[in-house]
Amino acid sequence: MNKKIVVFLFLICTAYFSFAQTIKSPDEFLGYPLGSKYTPHHKIVSYFKYAVSAMPQMMKLDEYGQTNEGRPLLLAYIASVENLAKLEDIRKNNLRLTGILTDQPGNVNTPAIVWLSYNVHGNETSSSEAAMKTLYELLNPANSKTKEWLKNTVVLIDPCINPDGRDRYVNWFNQMVGKNANPDRQSREHMEPWPGGRVNHYNFDLNRDWA
C-alpha cells in the first residue's frame, strides 16, 4: 500500500511540475496576434514580468533604470537552470577572457554571453515585438532547439532601449491608423510629426551613443 501511495504522489508531483513549466506565447498573453498591431511599452514590460514569474528557473529580470519620462528599462537574463544558478561566475569568467579581470586565467569552455538589444530607434517598432517572441522561444519548454542553445549560452535581452520614442510613435500610429493599416509611406499614420519616434525624450539619437 505504501508503495502505491509513493508512486501516486510521484505521478502527481511530476504532472504538477510539468504543468507549471509552461509559458503563454505573446499572442496568448496580449490577446491579439503578435505583429497585427503595435504593442505599447507597458504591455511589453508586463509580458517580461509575466515570463519571469512563469519560468523563474530559467530567467532573471532587472530594472536597470528609468527613462526621462519614467518608463522602466529592463534587462532579462535567460539561461539553462544550471547556468542561471552561476551567472556571477560566468560574468567574471567573461571578464577574465577579455583581460579586464586578471586574478586567474579565463576558462574558454564556459557559456558564451549573447546580448540582444531592441528598439534603439523608437519608430522602428517591430523590434520590441520581436523581443517578446525571442523571449518566448528561449523559454518555451517545447522548443528543443533553444534548449540545446542554452546549454552553452547565456542570453541577455533589453526589449526596448528607447521606450519614450517608441511610445511616442506607437501612440501616434494607433491614433491615426484606420481599421486596415495602409502600407503606403505617404498615408497619415506613417507621417509622424516632429520630433518623431526615432529619438529619445531629449531628441537624441541613441544609436549614436548607446554602449
Task: Explain the meaning of each model-derived region.
Residues 49, 53-56, 135-143, 211:
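Sec-exported extracytoplasmic/periplasmic mature domains
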Residues 32-38, 120-124, 202-211:
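The substrate-binding groove and active-site-proximal loops of carbohydrate-active enzymes
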Residues 70, 105, 111-113, 117-126:
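Short HxH-centered metal-ligating active-site micro-motif
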Residues 1-24:
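Bacterial Sec-dependent N-terminal signal peptides
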Residues 68, 81-83, 120-125, 161-166:
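Solvent-exposed loop/turn segments at secondary-structure junctions
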Residues 40, 70, 119, 157, ...:
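Divalent metal-coordination and catalytic microenvironments
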Residues 74-80, 90-95, 102-104, 108-111, ...:
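Surface-exposed loop and adjacent secondary-structure segments within mature catalytic domains
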Residues 21-61, 68, 72:
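N-terminal hydrophobic targeting/anchoring segments and the immediately downstream early-domain regions
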